């Protein structure tokens, strides 16, 4: 593999050639944002809204809460490698803990894989735009700092993991490489190549025996599960028998499964082995991407310290968890929803930690529908990850899991108008401009622009999914492609009509036109009632809407999720919560 949180696309791994013109997408990371109620142009809003000193303090206090002297004396021998991928955190990192238990020295490594910065499978868009690249860079810098504080460091190597990891295992005579298991084909293929190349090596056993070619001991890759709230081994069914309907999955795991505790932290993970050159975290320009400044929108700060800071800020400092269910459908501002998804996608934030913080909040403050709803969203995230195992590459094919035969258009001019926010529909255009400028879009916005692309424009849903892959900070393949298959009507859901009426969505979720006026300044001077229907004051609509209003918005099943009604009535995944 967002991965709520990152990742690669699926299909023929790494060798695909673009069938369409390569998109030139120059992202940037200065993501700024408006306040919920501001009627004039707001200033930049950082997420989390804490100073660097506050984030560091919250991070250290959280780590201290999870430190345990009860882990016992370290008895392992030799060197173990921790191969970081989409698990860029110290807290609740089972791969890191297992390496500590089994060794006397840990070598943490991150591989800057050039394939992550290649092009998507079908339409040749950048796999990773500059915004997400910058976010990952910040995550790596923060991970390196936190590891150093705990007696380690982070080795940064540029190249393919299947070459780098076995080479390091041989050089440091490592007995085991620990990593978190991924679920989608490109990442799984890399895991298999790493395993195959490790098997060609002969290394010492964990008992510290020398590197004797006759000993027959090979370095092994040990994959652990740590990307979901519910552990895969605790599901009441195997993934091949996963229910096709989310509600059945949710009810089953809530009734029959327990969420495991976060792993404890030793006081120190050190020492590392002797390393001559730890390398450096790259700059965006070193990845062949261009960084540009923007002056509006949310500025997400990458890294575990920022992630823990956001949880603290949203739950405890601002006390917003208690109203989450009422505000989560907002579109403008940093605090209408948790905004945890970018850190979940990068693995900078553990879903089990969020679970434990929700339970602590319920114990110390209050328990209501809002506190439950955050967990409800995390179960959606779990569901799509487990579903990706069951569906494999069907998740990424035009017909989707249902193998539906639809004659999609791939009109490049029409698609470009959509991705650039030039459709003539202010609500669509404002959302697309926010995405390009910030790497983020509200859950409500994602539903609306998906419905418009596939229902009103008739464009191939995979073009939209790949553009989201380029742009989103919280991209992960399971959630992204799972949501798009549902929105396109080719997913596992038995209901097919997920049309979103733009006039109705505008009326319900941006009645004053503040969101569209913020992202489309040319509409700001118009009366509020005219901002969504500006007529000659705005671009001509690129297509006519198939429906003006529809009964299938609100509490019905829609593109990414409609967030009304009881949990039983919701069938869509939430992304960007």
UniProtKB/Swiss-Prot annotation:
InterPro entries (UniProt xref): Cry_DASH, Crypto/Photolyase_FAD-like_sf, Crypto/Photolyase_N_sf, Cryptochr/Photolyase_FAD-bd, Cryptochrome/DNA_photolyase_1, DNA_photolyase_N, Rossmann-like_a/b/a_fold
GO cellular component, one term: mitochondrion
GO MF annotation, one: FAD binding
Region (Disordered): 550-577
SUPFAM superfamilies per UniProt: Cryptochrome/photolyase FAD-binding domain, Cryptochrome/photolyase, N-terminal domain
Expression (tissue specificity): Expressed in the endosperm and embryo 96 hours after seed imbibition. In the embryo, detected in the root meristem, the root cap, the shoot apical meristem and the epidermis of cotyledons. In adult plants, detcted in roots, the whole leaf lamina, the stem and in glandular trichomes.
Domain Photolyase/cryptochrome alpha/beta: from-to ranges: 78-219
Protein name: Cryptochrome DASH, chloroplastic/mitochondrial
Species classification: Eukaryota, Viridiplantae, Streptophyta, Embryophyta, Tracheophyta
